Every structure is written in structure tokens, then in C-alpha cells.
Amino acid sequence: MAVITIGGVTKDYAVGTTYEQIAQEYQEQYNNTIALVTENGKIRELHKKVSKDADVKFITLSDTIGHKTYERSAIMLFVKAVHDIMGKDVRIKVEFSIGKGLYCAIQGDKKLDDNSIKLINKRMNDMVAADLPITKKPYP
């Protein structure tokens, strides 16, 4: 068991419990979706597991870091969908933000058309529905 302190309240959790499971217990206390946690001051993704006693704080989508994490996840989802539909030889450049959106340029031999846009949108929705995790992989 690990002792987890959240907002001054301590509770025992089994080692191996994910921060997502813990966040689900507290989500109703927050106006915005919990996106990340800090474990003893270090940012952790929700799929990470409890391994030791820790002081935990929740980061929501209304927090700057939570919003940036959400934005990066949306970009990765978009890039994956474009590559799945148009091929990996297509290059995607995230140029700048426009209001609450992002301007992205797709470069390569293949041209973007209405059908490609529909297929990319469908692929993104399918991946969201499948609840596929986004995981980090270290590269040398």
C-alpha cells in the first residue's frame, strides 16, 4: 500500500493503482477535466501507477499545463490520422494558433481534398472512441 495525500487528506491506495483511477474519485470536485497529476511536485500522466507514498495534486484542462497537454495530444491524434489516411511520407507542420484553433500545413505529393478531410476526421473519431493511449517512448 502507498499513502497518497490529496489536499491534506491521506488515503491508502494499492501499489499499481493508476492516477486515472484516483482522479476518477475526485473528478466531481473539479469544474474541469483532470488531465495530469503532480506526484511530489513532478508532473505525471494519468496512466502512470502509484509506486510509493506521495503528495498528489491534480492538474485540469483549465490550468496552462493541462491545456497545453490537451493541445499536444490533439496534434498527435491529428498527425497519426493524417499518416494513416495519406501515408507517412506526408509532412504536417503546426504553424501557429488562430483563436482557439491551430493552423496546420500538410506537405507532400498527395493533395488534401474533401474526401481526405472526411477520412481523417473519421479516423480521429475512431481513435478517440477506441480510447487509445498516447505513450512516450525514449529515443537515444
Provide a role label for each language-model segment.
Residues 15-19, 58-87:
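N-terminal catalytic cores of NTP/NDP-binding nucleotidyl/phosphoryl-transfer enzymes
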